[in-house]
């Protein structure tokens, strides 16, 4: 279900498969430790960690190195490859979950081909601590199945679940609560403990056999309900995670009974997928991400093909890497340590190579020196992306040229950076001073988002700057669909009381409410031009795709790719927001609206390129060429707003 969820074909709540995995993992590891304790009266930690090294490290090393290699061809050298390199390094030390928690980049959370390794990091962090605790219990003469041990585990689980609930609901007891609830190991531990407690329970007695079939059926229905109805608006993990967690626990507990349902679950196709599940999980997401990049117009077929291809790669990994190493009895003691060193050093060394190649290798120097690419990262873009195009800064503050008593000020999130060239050109042409202040991932809203620590601080800075500059025209641009359709963890807009939206329609109501509060505040006392979000592009990195197909000699594919238009209907959430905003702004005389679709699109389709050059540098941000196409439209909107020709 996780794989189908990632393909986008089915199961909006397929992410609950990870929670099922945590329960199963807690159960399996506890059974192994209980068996060892019963046979030897102790837990040999060195043997345990040696087995984990042989089981986990070789396969994840193979997948990480393979992903790094493919990223050279399928990801942009302008920041994305660095993100993958950093993720690979964090994943090598099983710290990917902390890495993602600390990131503010939408791309790092949404489209990173190593994003899925956060769950492996959580599992290994649990494995690092739990056996040690059981070892300490053993030294204290506490049996694993004793009442005291069970009560201690239940207390920890209740605490973990409680904090998870509050964090998932956005409670500010810790920074970036929604992200911490999702990625934080302490708030996932209760899911493992449920599996541990099932392992500590005696097998279901025969007198309960009559319950097996209905309980298993109900559990399967509950799982299907959760994967079908949960989505990005579900406050997760929180209380919602209890459905897949306890359903999985019941399936494990009653699964030993021979019923029609258990025999179906144990059928050969499911057994095969179970055997390759670890490597399949490691490989499916990177291949899906790369399929989206190389075949952007194929939203369903390419990801499905990638998922099927990952089955073959996973089978190869199982037969040639996992099983030979895991079953090698000669790999003991110091040899296991050497294996661990090799598995850690290899992706670290390869990540260094990819980092170097992203600036010097495989023809990418030519790509970086391409005039079109350079134009996409102008002086104004350096304000957003740092001193070099690989170093993204979180905020921008800049004032340049023009008459001091007439100022156009541009504010917003990263979307504002994509329009900085156009608005700066309008200011220059009409003798305005131009000022900017925008923060990556922080939209201009009355209620600052909680998923980033600094959004409230940036909003306060922006407000201070607006009051200080007192602009003649305030230009606002947000990538609105990111905050309305649940595209990012914790990024969904809330109402002024902090209430989370249940779906995108309620989120849209909150978005309009926030606009209403903003427009009635003293922030927008000036004339205001709202630049609405451009339609989405199907191509994540068009220039890189052009280079990719040129490298493999498929020039026809390049030409066809750049001739393709994208349907305006593909931006349905964006279109819904644009309509609602326009309706609201009619009520305010000091507000003008400019929709980039009026330049990019006809009634049905939108251009992604002009004269062979891309208008987008990713799926949603305009290149300088795309931005400058907006100059006339923005000029007319501002002229009408301030009654100037």
Give the ranges of each region predicted by the language model:
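Membrane-interface helix/loop caps of multi-pass membrane proteins
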Residues: 1-331, 345-349, 644
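Extracellular/periplasmic envelope-modification machinery, especially enzymes
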Residues: 140, 232, 292-301, 306-307, ...
């Amino acid at each position: 279900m996780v794989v189908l969820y990632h393909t986008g074909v089915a199961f909006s709540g397929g992410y609950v498969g990870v929670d099922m995995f945590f329960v199963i993992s807690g159960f399996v590891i506890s059974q192994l430790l209980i068996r060892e304790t019963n046979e030897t009266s102790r837990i040999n930690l060195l043997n345990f960690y040696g087995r984990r090294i042989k089981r986990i490290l070789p396969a994840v090393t193979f997948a990480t190195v393979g992903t790094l290699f493919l990223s050279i061809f399928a990801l942009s050298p302008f920041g994305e490859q660095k993100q993958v390199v950093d993720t690979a390094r964090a994943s090598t030390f099983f710290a990917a979950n902390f890495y993602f928690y600390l990131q503010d980049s939408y791309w790092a959370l949404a489209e990173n081909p190593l994003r899925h390794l956060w769950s492996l990091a959580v599992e290994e962090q649990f494995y690092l601590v739990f056996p040690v605790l059981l070892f300490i219990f053993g030294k204290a003469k506490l049996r694993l199945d004793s009442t005291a041990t069970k009560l201690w585990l239940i207390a920890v689980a209740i605490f973990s679940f409680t904090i998870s609930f509050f964090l998932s609901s956005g409670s500010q007891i810790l920074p970036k609560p929604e992200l911490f609830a999702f990625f934080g190991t302490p708030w996932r531990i209760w899911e493992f403990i449920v599996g541990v407690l099932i392992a500590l329970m005696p097998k279901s007695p025969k007198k309960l056999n009559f319950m097996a079939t209905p309980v298993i059926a109900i559990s399967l229905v509950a799982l299907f309900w959760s994967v079908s109805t949960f989505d990005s608006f579900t406050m997760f993990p929180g209380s919602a995670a209890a459905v897949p967690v306890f359903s999985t626990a019941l399936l494990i507990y009653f699964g030993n009974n021979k019923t029609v349902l258990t025999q179906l679950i144990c059928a050969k196709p499911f057994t095969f997928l179970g055997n390759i599940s670890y490597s399949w999980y490691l490989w499916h997401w990177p291949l899906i991400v790369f399929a989206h990049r190389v075949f952007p117009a194929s939203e369903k077929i390419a990801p499905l093909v990638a998922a099927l291809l990952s089955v073959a790669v996973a089978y190869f990994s199982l037969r040639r890497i996992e099983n030979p190493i895991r079953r090698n009895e000669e790999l003991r003691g110091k040899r296991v340590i050497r294996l661990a060193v090799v598995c850690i050093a290899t992706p670290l060394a390869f990540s260094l190579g990819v980092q170097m190649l992203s600036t010097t290798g495989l023809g990418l120097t030519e790509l970086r020196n391409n005039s079109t690419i350079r134009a996409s990262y102008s002086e104004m873009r350096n304000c957003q992306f740092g001193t070099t195009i690989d170093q993204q800064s979180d905020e921008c503050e800049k004032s340049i040229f023009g008459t001091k008593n007439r100022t156009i000020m541009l504010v917003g999130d990263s979307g504002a950076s994509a329009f900085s060239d156009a608005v700066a050109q309008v200011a220059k042409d009409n003798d305005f001073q131009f000022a900017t202040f925008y923060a990556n991932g922080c939209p201009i809203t009355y209620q600052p988002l909680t998923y980033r620590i600094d959004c409230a601080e940036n909003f306060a800075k922006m407000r201070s700057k607006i009051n200080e500059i007192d602009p003649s025209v305030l230009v606002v641009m947000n990538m609105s669909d990111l905050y309305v359709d649940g595209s990012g963890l914790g990024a969904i807009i809330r109402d002024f009381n902090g209430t989370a939206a249940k779906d995108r329609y309620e989120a849209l109501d909150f978005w309009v409410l926030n606009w209403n509060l903003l427009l009635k505040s003293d922030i927008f006392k000036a004339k205001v031009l709202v630049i609405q979000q451009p339609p989405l592009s199907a191509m994540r990195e068009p220039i890189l795709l052009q280079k990719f197909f040129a490298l493999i000699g498929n020039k026809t594919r390049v030409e066809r790719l750049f001739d393709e238009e994208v349907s305006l209907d593909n931006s349905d959430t964006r279109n819904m927001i644009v309509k609602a905003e326009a309706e609201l702004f009619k009520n305010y005389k000091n507000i003008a609206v400019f929709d980039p679709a009026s330049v990019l699109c006809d009634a049905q389709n939108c251009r992604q390129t002009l004269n062979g050059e891309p208008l987008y540098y990713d799926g949603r941000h305009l290149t300088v060429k795309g931005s400058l196409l907006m100059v006339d439209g923005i000029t007319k909107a501002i002229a009408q707003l301030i009654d100037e020709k």
